Amino acid sequence: FILFSLIPLSSYFFNVWMPYQKIALKVENTEFTRKDLVEFIRFNQRLSEEQGNQFDLGSSLFQSLQLLAENEIAFLYATEFGLTVDEWEIDEAFFLKLGLYNNFNLESEEDEEVFKERKIQFLNQIQIDENKFKEIIRKSLFREKLRRELSREIPTLQQHKYIYEIALEDISTSNLNKIQKEITATSNISDIVKKYSIDPEVMRGAGDFGWIPKGAKPDLDYLFFSENNQALRPKELSEPFIDQENSVFKIYIISDVNESLELSEENFEIISEGILTNFFNEKSQLVDMQYGLDNETFNWINDKVQVASIFNN
């Protein structure tokens, strides 16, 4: 009888328990198992659903691994920047993520009861305990606080350039010369963009990027903001760039330069996130970080997340 009872237990151990415990990510001394990753993805998936947003399960695994690693690196460097997270901040961050912005006060007993009920419902839906839930939010807060700290050095006033984009199929020399001639002669580049761009949204403003500072479009910084007179000059067509996704070519024009404009909130956020990304890229070379992701792990985690989504919705 004992022998027969051990067989199902050993089968459960090898087929159910052990796969969950395999390491998916290691950052210094902290290990994240497949189970941790499934819970992290389900946490963010459920938050997206609560906010009424679509959640792309196909790309979520890689994004979640990267975000887990970044959160852990932020936590590792928190002391260096004097960063801490209090208990009340965890609760506040959670109800903000749920979209409870207005007329909500955690100091009110009634609102606190509503919050507790929402939290219990949320945890039951994704099947994780409160300690794990708090740890996920706590590490994400360290990431956000690090971003704010690094952003302190961003100048409020910066050089901006007014950028246009033209989508083309015909990039023959004769066509480009014709466009260049008209741009040189005009004081209203917007009309030229609308005349030649094949972007179906051009009449609704597509192709008009407006005032752009360095870092707002990092992939094109070298074109607009290179040093030593290497940057694109005003009213000069750039070389054509291939947009493979839309099967068109893109050319860029700078219409004007302002040496001191105040950063918009949107551009500040983009630049801030870029600085944080650079920080993580630099520090990831210094910390012991290992990914345990192969095809079998990828498929296993996706299957578990999909099953959890079906049964917990």
What are these regions (language model features)?
Residues 1-60, 293-313:
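Short, low-structural-confidence N-terminal segments
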Residues 22, 107, 115, 159, ...:
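A C-terminal, polar beta->alpha supersecondary segment
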Residues 22-30, 50-55, 59-65, 74-84, ...:
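Second-shell loop/turn segments in exported
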Residues 38-61, 80-158, 170-175:
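Charged, solvent-exposed helices and adjacent loops that form client-binding or oligomerization surfaces
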Residues 71-75, 143, 186:
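Alpha-helical transmembrane segments of polytopic integral membrane proteins
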Residues 90, 183, 190-194, 203, ...:
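Structured N-terminal alpha/beta-domain signature
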Residues 117-169, 195-197, 216-266:
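Proteostasis/folding factors centered on peptidyl-prolyl cis-trans isomerases
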